């Protein structure tokens, strides 16, 4: 281009009317603050052909959360199945656009631009929420995790900068909207927070499950990617996570009100190097078991023996990241089952 005298922006010239038209349209979209979302450093705007506000409102609510009046889970599922919502006047075949813009020096760069029917977008979003579905504590106020809450699971909430990685946030938004694979950085950031805090929240467990359902890996098979505890699973990493949860339950029962458990000291090493750590945990378990009364002792011993029967005599020396994900899900599922049982007993 330079040989023709085209330098800087002149190597891709834009006509005056075209420049006016797209900047005026973009400014109009950005002025509607209710339908503009910021994900990391990416500003996301969406619109439908025909410009009816209901498409923008529904699209933003489905993708980012917001609980707009008149929008329900049933509406989302109907559109995902290609069925119209006559009461809302929404056509699933209406062309719909999503634009993600990010700053680039003194300019803007297009992080992603998606065009599809509105129904196809709703199917991608609905599929994402179904992958994310996992048993949750009763105190959680969300029935599903909106994008902003999902990204919050990847950051240290005690740090000064609570913003997620901009590139990861944009890639995650694009994956959900397009139905593509989740970025590896989403899983890595989630696992990093679990290891740093030794705490598996509902959101983090949901991310692990959704990630490996969309990005399959033999070390974290489908049998462990269930909504609730899969007692029939013989997966070693998943079973080790379950075993760790029961060991912790025995310790808490033997020492009511303790401030720290084996999770605070051994969780990370147990997930990464089980062959080295589980013999130590078993010795602690024997000491804790002796403090329990007869009925409690039998109850926990049966669970431990059943899990050890699945595992056999030898444990893995090291586990991959995917196996650690299966371990985390096993621990989470087993722990949630214990808490659910306690709540049911308290409500009787």
Q: Would you name each region that the model predicts?
A:
Residues 1-348:
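Extended alpha-helical scaffolding segments
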């Amino acid at each position: 281009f330079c040989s023709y005298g085209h330098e800087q922006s002149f190597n891709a010239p834009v006509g005056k009317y075209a420049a006016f038209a797209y900047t005026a349209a973009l400014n109009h979209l950005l002025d509607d603050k209710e339908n503009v979302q910021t994900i990391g450093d990416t500003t996301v705007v969406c619109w439908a052909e025909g410009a009816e506000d209901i498409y923008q409102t529904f699209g933003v609510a489905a993708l980012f959360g917001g609980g707009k009046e008149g929008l329900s889970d049933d509406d989302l599922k109907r559109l995902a199945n290609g069925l119209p919502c006559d009461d809302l006047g929404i056509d699933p075949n209406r062309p719909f656009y999503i634009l993600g813009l990010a700053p680039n020096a003194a300019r803007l760069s297009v992080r992603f631009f998606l065009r599809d029917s509105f129904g196809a977008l709703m199917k991608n979003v609905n599929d994402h929420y179904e992958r994310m579905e996992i048993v949750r504590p009763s105190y959680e106020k969300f029935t599903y995790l909106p994008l902003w809450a999902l990204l919050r699971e990847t950051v240290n909430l005690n740090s000064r900068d609570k913003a997620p990685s901009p590139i990861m946030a944009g890639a995650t938004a694009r994956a959900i909207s397009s139905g593509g694979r989740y970025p590896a950085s989403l899983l890595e950031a989630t696992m990093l927070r679990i290891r740093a805090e030794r705490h598996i929240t509902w959101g983090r467990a949901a991310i692990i499950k959704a990630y490996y359902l969309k990005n399959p890996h033999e070390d974290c098979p489908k049998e462990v990617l269930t909504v609730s505890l899969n007692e029939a699973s013989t997966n070693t990493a998943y079973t080790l996570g379950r075993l760790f949860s029961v060991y912790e339950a025995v310790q808490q029962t033997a020492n009511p009100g303790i401030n720290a458990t084996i999770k605070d000291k051994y969780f990370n090493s147990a997930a990464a190097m089980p062959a080295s750590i589980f013999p130590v945990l078993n010795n602690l378990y024997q000491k804790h078991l002796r403090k329990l009364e007869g009925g409690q002792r039998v109850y926990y011993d049966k669970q431990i023996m059943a899990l050890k029967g699945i595992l056999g005599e030898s444990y893995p020396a090291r586990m991959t990241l995917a196996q650690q994900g299966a371990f985390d899900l096993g621990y989470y599922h087993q722990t949630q089952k214990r808490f659910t049982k306690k709540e049911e007993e308290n409500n009787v």
